[in-house]
Amino acid sequence: MPIRIPDQLPASDVLRNENIFVMSESRASTQEIRPLKVLLLNLMPKKIETETQFLRLLSNSPLQVDIELLRIDDRPSKNTPEEHLNTFYRQFELVKNRNFDGLIITGAPLGLVQFEDVAYWQHLQNIMAWAKAHVTSTLYICWAAQAGLKLLYNLPKRTREEKLSGVYYHDIHKPFHPLLRGFDDRFLAPHSRYADFDAEFLAEHTDLDILATSDVAGVYLAATKDKRNVFVTGHPEYDAYTLHGEYVRDLGEGLNPAIPVNYYPNDNPDNKPCASWRSHGHLLFANWLNYCVYQQTPYDLEKFSEANFTKDE
């Protein structure tokens, strides 16, 4: 949330240059606040588990956020009761004529599937195209980040030879960028993907701000100049045991998975894993809600227009 200070206080310019949200007394006197409208497009198989993880992160903010859950299509789910989907999830047809402050598109276990072979690929393209004219800021997670880069920049699908699984250190590159507000210089975050996000490749083929990278995992966090599209290639929403569940699942399927890196104490799967990324996940989502959504979105969503947004250089 912003701090309110006298209009001409000398500290205001210093703080604004550090991308700290400073509100003058004159602006505060006319400020209008309403709940933020955020749409969560849940592509993960275990939808109840995933929605809980994201709601946990979205709740850690003084801003009131109204969440609506969106399903990609009406195909039956193998891992979520149909009653749950019918009760709590909306079809795109029911929301497409409305505007939203934020959209989150989750990951999906489709790392080795070509985009054109994804059953709902056309539906996803339609939703991403719709978001450009109806959503202030979209947050793409893991596989969705790769899909978003394909649709927005026509980047080819790049796949690693071995699955990336574990908790990795990342370095920040633009310390005064709003999304990095309060970040440590180095932080931990989990990854579970085949997708390859090479920093040099993204820098050469896009105009994205590359905000955080890992020597092993590549680009972790990037955003368009106007902050309307934010790409997170890892899984900051994961619970302590999510990577463990995936590891055990892959073992059971005979895939001979590698032990997730920097996850189990002493790299022993018999030991209880430690969630070393929890504070990072909460901070990332709080920053996205504050700087990319709340400070950018119009008070009256009916007046939403792409023309309201400029690309900050």
Swiss-Prot record:
Its main location: cytoplasm. It catalyses: L-homoserine + succinyl-CoA = O-succinyl-L-homoserine + CoA. The keyword tRNA processing does not apply. The active site is at C142, H235, E237. The record marks G111 as: Important for acyl-CoA specificity. Keywords: Acyltransferase, Amino-acid biosynthesis, Cytoplasm, Methionine biosynthesis, Transferase. PANTHER family: HOMOSERINE O-SUCCINYLTRANSFERASE. Belongs to the MetA family. This is Homoserine O-succinyltransferase. It comes from Vibrio cholerae serotype O1 (strain ATCC 39315 / El Tor Inaba N16961).
